Amino acid sequence: MTHFTRNYSTRQMGFTIIEIMVVVIILGILAAIVVPRVMDRPDAARITKGKQDIRALESALNLYKLDNYDYPSTEQGLEALVQKPAGDPEARNWKQGGYVDRLPKDPWQRPYQYLKPGVHGEIDIFTLGADGQQGGEGVNADIGNWSLDQ
C-alpha cells in the first residue's frame, strides 16, 4: 500500500492576515454603499402596503354598494364591511360573512379613515401617514383612494 503525502509550505496553509483584512475592507465598502439604499425601503414598503389596503377596502366597498345600493355612511364606517350595520342607509342585502375578514390597520397601526360623502369623491378612504396629521410630505403624506396613482 502506497501512502501519498503532500508537502505544504507555510505559505499554502491558509489565508494570511493581510488577505483577510482586504476582504473585510471590501465588505465594509460594499456595506457603506448598500446599507443607505436599503434603509430607505421600509418607508416605501409601508406606503405600498397602505395603497394596497386602500385599494382592497375600496373594492370591498364597491361590492357592498352593489349589494345594498349605497355605500355605508360615515357613522357606519368601514366596520360595515365586517358586521352588518344598523341605521341608514339600511343594508338590506348585506352579504353573510361580510365583505372582508377583518379590517386592516394602516402601516402605522392606526385605523383607516372613511368619509361618505368624501371630500375628494363619493367616498374617501385614507390614512394620515406616519405623523398622523393631515397633509405632509414623503412618509408623512396622506394616502387616500383619490391619490393612489401618484
Language model feature labels by segment:
Residues 1-15:
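N-terminal leader/signal peptides at the extreme start of proteins
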Residues 2-4, 44-47, 59-62, 68, ...:
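Short, surface-exposed interaction loops/tails
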Residues 11-38:
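N-terminal single-pass transmembrane signal-anchor helix
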Residues 24, 51, 58:
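Conserved catalytic core of two-component sensor histidine kinases
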Residues 32, 40, 44, 66:
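Short, conserved catalytic or interaction motifs in soluble domains
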Residues 35, 40, 76, 83:
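Phosphate-coordinating loops and pocket residues in cytosolic domains that bind phosphorylated ligands
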Residues 37-55:
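Aliphatic-rich helix starts adjacent to a transmembrane/signal segment
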Residues 78-96:
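Acidic, glycine-rich loop-and-strand cores that form catalytic or ligand-binding grooves
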